[in-house]
C-alpha cells in the first residue's frame, strides 16, 4: 500500500534529509539532493537531527507494537486454553509471561548467576567477565559494578538482611562485600584448591558455606574470615550449595550425579540422593507453601503416606527435574520437558509452581500439583544459566550465556 505524504510533510522530510546529509559530511550528495528537491542552501535549526529522532521513534514504536502483539497473543492463547485471565488470577497464581519487561546488557561475558536483594528493589548479576553488577529491577537502571575478582564470578548470595553480599570465583577466592554503604570488599577468604562454584549464607548470617571443584564444602566465619569446617564426601566437582531456611541442614549437588544433605553443625552427611543419571547442576529448597501441591502429586504416583519434608528440587544435565523428600531420601516427582541441561530452579513463593532455566534457551513454569509444564518462555538467544523468583514482588529474573539479564513481570 503506497503511503501519500502531504506537501508540508514532503517539505519537512526533504529538509530533514538535507540536514542529515550535511551534518554527516555527504557534501556531494547534499548538493545534488538540494538541486533535485529544489531546496535553499540555508537549513533551518528546527530540522537539526530530525531524521534521527524520527527514525529512533519508529524503532521505539515498533518495539511497543511487538510487545503489545505478544501480550495479545498470550491473552488469546489463555482464552482458547481456558486458563484464568489476569483479572481472575490471584497473586499465588501469577507466573512470568512474555515479553520481558527489561533486557539488561552491560556484561562482557556469560551471566553465571542472578539474584534479588531480599529487601530493596535491587538485583545482582555475576558474570564470567569477573564483575558483579547491581541493577534496579523496577526501572531497569544500572546502578554500579563490584570489581575485585580476577576470574569468572560463579555465584553470589545475600545474608538475610541484605547487608552483606558473598561472591565466589574461579580465582579460588570467596569475597564479602559491604552492601550498605561503601560497596567495598571487606573480606577475602582463601582455602579451596580449585574453582569455587557456589556460596550461601546460613540464616543467622554468621557463617558462609562454599562449594568447590576440589570436591569439598567449607564453612567460613564471617567475623574473622576463618575456615571453621570442611565437609567431604562428594567424589567430583561440587556444583551448588543451598541452606534450608531453618539453617540446621544444607544441600549440595555434584558432578558425581548425587545430591547430599548435610547437618550444618557437624560434618555428617544426613542423606545421599542418587536417582539422576548425569551431573546435578542446581538445587532449590521448597517453601512450606509447596508441601500440599507436592504431596498431592506424590499421592497420584502412589508414594505412600503424607510426606513431611523438607522438600528439595534438583535439576540435572540428564534434562530432568526431581523433587525429593529429604527426610526419607525419596524422589517423589520427576518433571520431564526440557531439551537440554537444567541450569537453574526457583520456587514460586505461593508454592504452586516451580520455574526452571535450561540450556535449551527456555524458562519453564511447572504446575507441581499436576506435574506438567504449563508455560514455556523462549527467553534468551543462548543457554539460560540462572533464574530467581522474588519473594514479595511479582518478578522473575534470568541470566544467559548471551550476556543479558532479563526481568519478567508475573501476572
From Swiss-Prot:
Gene Ontology cellular component annotations, sorted alphabetically: axon cytoplasm; cell cortex; dendrite; dynactin complex; dynein complex; growth cone; kinetochore; kinetochore microtubule
All copies of domain LisH, residue ranges: 9-41
GO MF, one example: dynein complex binding
Domain of life of the native organism: Eukaryota
Major location category of this protein: cytoplasm
UniProt subcellular location: Cytoplasm, Cytoskeleton; Cytoplasm, Cytoskeleton, Microtubule organizing center, Centrosome
Gene3D superfamilies linked to this entry: 1.20.960.30, YVTN repeat-like/Quinoprotein amine dehydrogenase
SUPFAM superfamilies: Lissencephaly-1 protein (Lis-1, PAF-AH alpha) N-terminal domain, WD40 repeat-like
Placement of WD repeats on the sequence: 106-147, 148-187, 191-230, 233-272, 275-334, 337-376, 379-411
Record-linked CDD domains: WD40
Keywords for the protein's UniProt record, in alphabetical order: Cell cycle, Cell division, Coiled coil, Cytoplasm, Cytoskeleton, Microtubule, Mitosis, Repeat, Transport, WD repeat
Coiled coil feature spans: 56-83
GO biological process, one term: regulation of dendrite morphogenesis
InterPro entries in the record: Dynein_regulator_LIS1, G-protein_beta_WD-40_rep, LIS1_N, LisH, PAC1-like_LisH-like_dom, WD40/YVTN_repeat-like_dom_sf, WD40_repeat_CS, WD40_repeat_dom_sf
SMART domains listed in its UniProt record: LisH, WD40
Matching PANTHER family: WD REPEAT-CONTAINING PROTEIN POP1 (PTHR44129)
Family: Belongs to the WD repeat LIS1/nudF family.
Role: Positively regulates the activity of the minus-end directed microtubule motor protein dynein. May enhance dynein-mediated microtubule sliding by targeting dynein to the microtubule plus end. Required for several dynein- and microtubule-dependent processes.
Domain notes: Dimerization mediated by the LisH domain may be required to activate dynein.
Protein name as annotated: Lissencephaly-1 homolog
Name of the gene encoding the protein in the UniProt record: Lis-1
